């Protein structure tokens, strides 16, 4: 599409800016629109993630530049494939490893999110993720000076979903990581 390179460069530029510099500004924005605290505190955690990040766009663009050649696209067009068919029959199946790798990266990032969860869900412990609950549990157990076995068990239990997800999708995860290696 026209302007694709400018759009891509703007996305790459946003990756150069530190996320911490925008944390407070983002928080103020979400406070002003009423998305902080209670069940609405989940919205700033979910809605921005639906649109991907600059890193995701860069990753997928790099993958598709190397995996989807112009010859394949031209051959599909000659065979009568329209844009929708080209996307669903060729681009999506070719991009499955990269898309699944991005899903895994996003899931692990959201699962391990601590500061954003604490910032937006501070007053509703029923909505906390496992990492916030684990932090509070270890804080409570530290008061008694001991309970190291319980802390380690809680940390291990919090890692189990990620370990199971990794082993279940290891093939796609490794393929997605190897995407950046390039083809010689």
Regions found by a protein language model. Give the residues of each.
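A structural signal for multi-pass alpha-helical bundles of membrane permease subunits
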Residues: 1-184
């Amino acid at each position: 599409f026209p302007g694709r390179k400018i759009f891509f460069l703007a996305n790459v530029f946003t990756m150069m800016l530190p996320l911490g510099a925008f944390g407070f500004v983002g928080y103020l924005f979400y406070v002003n629109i009423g998305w902080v605290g209670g069940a609405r505190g989940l919205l700033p955690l979910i809605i921005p993630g639906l649109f991907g990040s600059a890193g995701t766009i860069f990753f997928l663009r790099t993958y598709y530049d190397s995996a989807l050649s112009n010859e394949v696209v031209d051959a599909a067009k000659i065979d009568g494939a329209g844009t929708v068919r080209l996307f669903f029959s060729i681009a999506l199946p070719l991009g499955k490893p990269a898309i699944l790798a991005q899903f895994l990266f996003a899931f692990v990032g959201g699962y391990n999110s601590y500061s954003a969860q604490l910032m937006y869900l501070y007053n509703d412990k029923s909505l906390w993720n496992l990492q916030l609950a684990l932090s509070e549990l270890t804080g409570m157990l530290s008061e008694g000076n001991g309970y190291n076995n319980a802390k380690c068990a809680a940390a291990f239990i919090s890692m189990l979903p990620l370990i199971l997800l990794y082993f279940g999708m290891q093939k796609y995860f490794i393929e997605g990581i190897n995407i950046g290696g390039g083809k010689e």
